[in-house]
């Protein structure tokens, strides 16, 4: 298959018109048996752009979407881009007060709303946006009342804001991360500039998006495929059995998932290599992956794997572990990856001094895909974006070859008798035990040592490992101060809708409402 790269496309305004002209009948979106071609995507997004202008919205105004994945979401994405408005995708799993905060904080003027989330809006403590467009049966008529011709051009450059995504709010209220068009083109261009196929798009590709569109990973993966002119398979909400069936039945060639989704697919009864024969590449990221899960995934899916690392603030991926580095037992299997061409990395200490290779500190990234700002939070922006560098809040190091290794979130480090202990290291070893499906490690208060290591464990199906079994397994592999002092077995690990572990929820069992979660 031929690789696809269209360097003349530099904004999402250009994407649908280009592909409507060159491959009008190619499916752009497949969703629950419905097909939207590139010509249809172009025309329907034109209608939405005209409608937004008719509703009095001007470039820079915020437009929110509260609903699950569907072809309408992508029509609205491109309609916003063409009208100059900024799309605010809202996590549909949030409560009414949480949704209200996002709509109020962003200053949303118009809300696209799926019917099933109407009760959420009704319960919001603040007034809803001035205009609500229902995505039910009346939506087609609403669109049809507007022209499908190209809207009057507005001033747009790669630096023009196009989306505002809210962080998951694991440490306080969610912040609105403003992203420009360049966030969805810079990495594609970087790979093409060096002829790298770490992640690539090819003629005939059909891409599964398991990650929600309100998450940077889902939105980025969708736009990369639209920019290439390939087909996106949208899942209303991720379900492991459905994902496996879609891969097998639709002949899906690429997929973008978080590690938890890989685990769920592999543990579905009867699932095996026969279900993944058309896959050529799996892109994963969003949370740490254990070596055991990665090696099992490589064996069963039997395709190329690429890990992506980044933040919403970096415009998704800034670092990639390419397929060639995915060698079971290899030294790079624990790496986050290598910066793309044009992306720089460094590690700093608490005083902001750059550290040498191998020294652990805060990972910082300078990428052309980085955010514009935190919406309405200049002080927070200045803390995170310093002289072009995004301060990730992740503890890690860079090796002599430039590969980035992430140890953990800095705030998640456990301080045991003055020694920093990183949960991800312990979790990775624990999940290598055949009786462990998943493990989460947190620090709990200890009067003698400051903190002790507490391990939450989800047992593998049909297994009942004892704390003694796990301790015996860990002793040869970890220093004594890293060993969990206690093990607690749980049925499942709490996660947010993006698949990230809600570590704070587990930690708060020990620390309660204390603002200082360290002794």
UniProtKB/Swiss-Prot annotation:
ATP binds at residues 216, 312, 394, 411. PANTHER family: LONG-CHAIN-FATTY-ACID--COA LIGASE (PTHR43767), NONRIBOSOMAL PEPTIDE SYNTHASE PES1 (EUROFUNG)-RELATED (PTHR43767:SF1). It comes from Streptomyces coeruleorubidus. Acyl:acyl-carrier protein ligase involved in the biosynthesis of a unique class of isonitrile lipopeptides (INLPs). Shows a strong preference for fatty acids with a short/medium-chain length (C4-C8) in vitro, and accepts alpha,beta-unsaturated fatty acids such as crotonate, which seems to be a physiological substrate. Acts twice during the INLP pathway, catalyzing the activation of crotonate ((2E)-2-butenoate) as well as (3R)-3-isocyanylbutanoate as acyl-adenylates (acyl-AMP), and then the acyl transfer to the dedicated acyl-carrier protein ScoB. Mg(2+) binds at residues 167, 313. This is Fatty acid--[acyl-carrier-protein] ligase ScoC. Its EC number is 6.2.1.-, 6.2.1.47. Keywords: ATP-binding, Fatty acid metabolism, Ligase, Lipid metabolism, Magnesium, Metal-binding, Nucleotide-binding. It catalyses: a medium-chain fatty acid + holo-[ACP] + ATP = a medium-chain fatty acyl-[ACP] + AMP + diphosphate; a medium-chain fatty acid + ATP + H(+) = a medium-chain fatty acyl-AMP + diphosphate; a medium-chain fatty acyl-AMP + holo-[ACP] = a medium-chain fatty acyl-[ACP] + AMP + H(+); octanoate + holo-[ACP] + ATP = octanoyl-[ACP] + AMP + diphosphate. Its cofactor is Mg(2+). It is an enzyme of class 6 (ligase). Belongs to the ATP-dependent AMP-binding enzyme family. One of its GO terms (molecular function) is ATP binding. One of its GO terms (biological process) is fatty acid metabolic process.
